[in-house]
Amino acid sequence: MSQLTHINAAGEAHMVDVSGKAETVREARAEAYVEMQATTLAMIIDGSHHKGDVFATARIAGIQAAKRTWELIPLCHPLMLSKVEVNLQAQPEHNRVRIESLCRLTGKTGVEMEALTAASVAALTIYDMCKAVQKDMVIGPVRLLAKSGGKSGDFKVGECHD
């Protein structure tokens, strides 16, 4: 079983030392959903929401959040991301918005937290912009879809990993 890398031998939280690691291309994808009433989703789709373009705002928020993950998650390293992508898709058949984020860099540590943060903050931004018309929206699930690069190997949802 894998060890918790952010806990030292004394059981204390610490930042992992990545100075000895090789730089490799690392990438991660994550997703989040925001469930809402059909009327709320229709306002987003047709652009009639009084706060403006919900998807554009959520996309920018997700990108900004990925770049600032190290300020939000205590033991994350500040990273020089080379790519952050946030895509939003209305799914009227399910009364929800699907958000998928992608983060990439060449570096010594992974970008899973950055991808998860991007998707999460984009979802929170949708909630913030739409809460005046609906307060009972549901955010989730939020999950890592895939990661590649690094010592721990690749991961993809649905593949068995021990």
Curated annotation (Swiss-Prot):
Enzyme Commission no: 4.6.1.17
- Name one molecular function that GO assigns to this entry: cyclic pyranopterin monophosphate synthase activity
- What is catalyzed by this enzyme? (8S)-3',8-cyclo-7,8-dihydroguanosine 5'-triphosphate = cyclic pyranopterin phosphate + diphosphate
Q: Does the keyword Lyase apply?
A: yes
The entry's function note states: Catalyzes the conversion of (8S)-3',8-cyclo-7,8-dihydroguanosine 5'-triphosphate to cyclic pyranopterin monophosphate (cPMP).
Describe the subunit structure. Homohexamer; trimer of dimers.
Q: Which family does it belong to?
A: Belongs to the MoaC family.
Show the NCBIfam families listed in the entry.
moaC, PRK09364.1
Q: What is this protein called?
A: Cyclic pyranopterin monophosphate synthase
Q: Which organism is it from?
A: Klebsiella pneumoniae subsp. pneumoniae (strain ATCC 700721 / MGH 78578)
